[in-house]
């Protein structure tokens, strides 16, 4: 029986993580979780899983939950998030929150020697050097939950990572993959939220449409697997059947395939190095699919992917700036305050405005994050 703490239980990854726990009640126990403002959902999860600690975003929601939570301790805010991450009984902390708010809980959980199931891209994007140093220092495993990084991780089982020639990350292309840049001037929030292959939260669905999601994954892969950016490629693959590939020195290529279902990489992170049945996921039938398509990625068409490569190669504080600018811009787009292509423009302005700090401390990263958010908000 593995004890699990789940950060971000009401989001897309969080709800699918609970599906996995539900499927294997003899294998996993939920000891703590966090939610934002979805209190009705939190009540249902408490009633089903009986966790010891639950954290909510706002203090005013604590009393609402306490009235129905029984023996479950209710906490709130950033301190509450840390309490969930540091639950003394938790062996695995699944970080499924959206945005840079996931950074500090991850670092503290690593220091407490928890195994980390990392679904929060922004943690490695904003502070990859700090996270990987901490993981090495405390001998902690970071197990990828993203389908692409899980695919690479699985392809590397039993392999010598020094023999890697290239990582090939696949991209569905998002909801606007067939549109020209001229057509993107007029797209709506509703258009952007219709992803062709995956069921995800609103922020990551917009990131998929801009291709920033893939850019974040490139930076994340750089840190997780220690591969230079020059050896990380992205290929457009509309079917989302091949989740990523690894090319080795002898030009052999290993790929991980499967029907698009986030529960597969989530469960693998929780059961690693073992595997368990996942009977209600769709079996892959290649003869039904017939053909798999691949296209070269155009970084002028998808400028956010180019920004991510530029930020990653610049290093230091630049990825944190790019990430903060993107979070503010995407939120403004979701609120219909800016157009779709303005997201790219705001990120570019923020990156051009910033002077890179080579090895920023945690405090400097948090300051840069806040300053970048203020700068971008002033541009809107």
Curated annotation (Swiss-Prot):
Needs which cofactor? Answer: Mg(2+); Mn(2+)
The enzyme's first-digit EC class, named in words, is oxidoreductase
Which reactions is this enzyme annotated as catalysing?
2-C-methyl-D-erythritol 4-phosphate + NADP(+) = 1-deoxy-D-xylulose 5-phosphate + NADPH + H(+)
A Pfam family reported for this protein in Swiss-Prot or TrEMBL: DXP_reductoisom
Q: Name one GO biological process term.
A: isopentenyl diphosphate biosynthetic process, methylerythritol 4-phosphate pathway involved in terpenoid biosynthetic process
Q: Which Gene3D superfamilies match?
A: 1.10.1740.10, NAD(P)-binding Rossmann-like Domain
Q: List the disulfide bonds.
A: none
Enzyme Commission designation = 1.1.1.267
Q: Which residues bind NADPH?
A: 10-13, 36-38, 120, 122, 201
Positions binding Mn(2+) in this chain are 146, 148, 217
- Alphabetical keyword list: Isoprene biosynthesis, Manganese, Metal-binding, NADP, Oxidoreductase
Q: One MF term from GO for this chain? A: 1-deoxy-D-xylulose-5-phosphate reductoisomerase activity
Record keyword Metal-binding present: yes
- Give me the residues that bind 1-deoxy-D-xylulose 5-phosphate, please: 121, 147-148, 172, 195, 208, 213-214, 217
InterPro entries reported in the protein's UniProt record: DXP_reductoisomerase (IPR003821), DXP_reductoisomerase_C (IPR013644), DXP_reductoisomerase_N (IPR013512), DXPR_C (IPR026877), DXPR_C_sf (IPR036169), NAD(P)-bd_dom_sf (IPR036291)
Q: In which pathway does it act?
A: Isoprenoid biosynthesis; isopentenyl diphosphate biosynthesis via DXP pathway; isopentenyl diphosphate from 1-deoxy-D-xylulose 5-phosphate: step 1/6
Sequence similarity: Belongs to the DXR family.
Main function: Catalyzes the NADPH-dependent rearrangement and reduction of 1-deoxy-D-xylulose-5-phosphate (DXP) to 2-C-methyl-D-erythritol 4-phosphate (MEP).
User: This chain belongs to which protein, by name?
Assistant: 1-deoxy-D-xylulose 5-phosphate reductoisomerase 2
Organism equals: Bacillus anthracis
Phylogenetic placement of the source organism? Bacteria, Bacillati, Bacillota, Bacilli, Bacillales
- The UniProt gene name for this protein comes to dxr2
